[in-house]
Amino acid sequence: MTVTDTFKLFILRHGQSELNSENIFCGWIDAQLTEKGKSQARHSAKLIKQFCDSNNISLPQIGYTSRLIRTQQTMDVILEELGLKHTNYVITTNTNIKEELQDTRFEGSMPVLQTWRLNERHYGAWQGQRKPDILKEYGKEKYMYIRRDYNGKPPKVNLNLEMVQEENDQGSSTGYDFKEPNRHLKYGPEEKANERLPESESLCEVVVRLKPFLNNVVLSTANKISQESCVIVGHGSSVRSLLKVLEGISDEDIKDVDIPNGIPLVIELDRDNYSFVRKFYLDPESAKVNAQMVRDEGFEKNP
């Protein structure tokens, strides 16, 4: 089966964020991209274009990001580099995707659908904490179990202290320098759709909330409008979850999968039944080096 016979997903983890660079658990905290992260996104776009040109296939026709700004900034840079105009739209379980894609707002513009189901795993009370500090507190075995095991789960977040409050926010005086955005303000569409947002997650729970989106939105849309490819910008855990579902990776083996920042991974699926065909990084050497750096996070000294 050749490249032109398959449906292609260009999947990547967002470029480096401000908290990535500080070795801090980010989770649902809305960290911005660093200049390095923006550079990674531009390089990703060039790799995608080179691949499409060399295989005589079209550039992606639709994009997907999480609701967190670091994926949206990564997508913005990629599409700007590719010369593609785009329109962002938040989707929930109440969204009729087919009707939305026929909306005139997308005429001459690539749709980019944003969903919380692509958000990073919610790291609970670990969010905003330095990884070496958590390693020291929990010890190597428990740290690696919670961080890497399919069922490992951090303690729940205290949203009264670790989320920006809508009124009378106390800032860092609560003991937390980095907080996730106020949910009522950030996730209004999800609140209206009665989506249940987590306060801590295992990778297993990320898979559960992401799988319906993959099947009912990404693959269903590809089938209905005969797409050749799409681009998905996610996070370490949401990309691992996509791989687990698409490739059928076991619960045991998924703990050994590490996702580097800003390097496109191509997943090819059979057009007839969307079964897995193959996967490969567009920059395999860099992916290998940077994936090992991800695995080693927390074992370095504090900056």
Swiss-Prot record:
Pathways involved: Carbohydrate degradation; glycolysis; pyruvate from D-glyceraldehyde 3-phosphate: step 3/5
Documented EC number(s): 5.4.2.11
Cellular-component GO terms for this entry: cytoplasm
Catalytic activity: (2R)-2-phosphoglycerate = (2R)-3-phosphoglycerate
BP GO annotations: glycolytic process
Chain residue ranges for the region called Disordered: 168-198
Site (Transition state stabilizer) residue list: 235
Family statement: Belongs to the phosphoglycerate mutase family. BPG-dependent PGAM subfamily.
Record's protein name: Phosphoglycerate mutase 3
